[in-house]
Amino acid sequence: MKKSLNNSSMWDVKPIKLSILVPTRDTVHSHFAYCLTQLVRTTSEAGIDTYLFFDSNTILLNQREKLIEKAKEVRSDYVLWLDSDMMFPSTTALRLLEHNKDIVACNYMKRAKPLKTVAYTDLTNWDSWVPLEPKDELIKVEGVGMGCMLMKLNTFDKLQKPYFEFTYKEDSQDWYGEDFNLLKKLRDLGYDVLIDTILSMDIKHLVIYAFGSEN
């Protein structure tokens, strides 16, 4: 196992195989590309067997299903979901792995006003979003976006396909995304969905903004 400044005793116990899964369109943000290269380098130098899979398509449900199958093919222990419009520290995977939890994610801001985050403690109440505030302990939520989420691959073992679905909420006349639906299935199986609020402070959500005369 390669030694580096990023090495830790936790990696000496058992080599870990990590698949980084990224659903994309035709292009990715340059800031994301830079963060990703630094993350892969840092994670690999820590002795973790690191794989990177992209799926460039137009149907997000298909992308996520195919990416999980790629992770299974290489027999990953963990998967790190990243969206291609995110910025994150090079140590992101290491810091999430250190928790040794089934599901641990980062909270981050949505890309539209009113400014809210993507994590909720109660999926029946859209006002229950979790503010970006650092806490000493991991916090439990009912739902969070998958822009930066680490999962043990074996959490999928008890699930039936399709893993990812959209569902319509009649009461609020809107949709649950594939992220919230997956996490609900896993919560129903007894898994906790946890947020690293300290790491979340370093996560950015990229958007293209058009400057014009009104600015």
Range-by-range predicted roles:
Residues 2-15, 158-215:
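C-terminal catalytic/acceptor-binding lobe
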Residues 68, 89-167:
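Conserved catalytic core of nucleotide-sugar-dependent glycosyltransferases
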Residues 35-38, 66, 95, 181:
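Alpha-helical elements of Rossmann-like donor-binding domains used by nucleotide-donor carbohydrate transfer enzymes
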Residues 76-87:
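Short beta-strand-to-loop acidic/aromatic patch adjacent to the donor-nucleotide binding site
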Residues 44, 97, 187:
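Anion (oxyanion) recognition and catalysis
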Residues 1-57, 62:
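N-proximal low-complexity "stem/linker" segments adjacent to membrane-targeting elements
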Residues 65-78:
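Active-site nucleotide-sugar/metal-binding loop of Leloir-type enzymes
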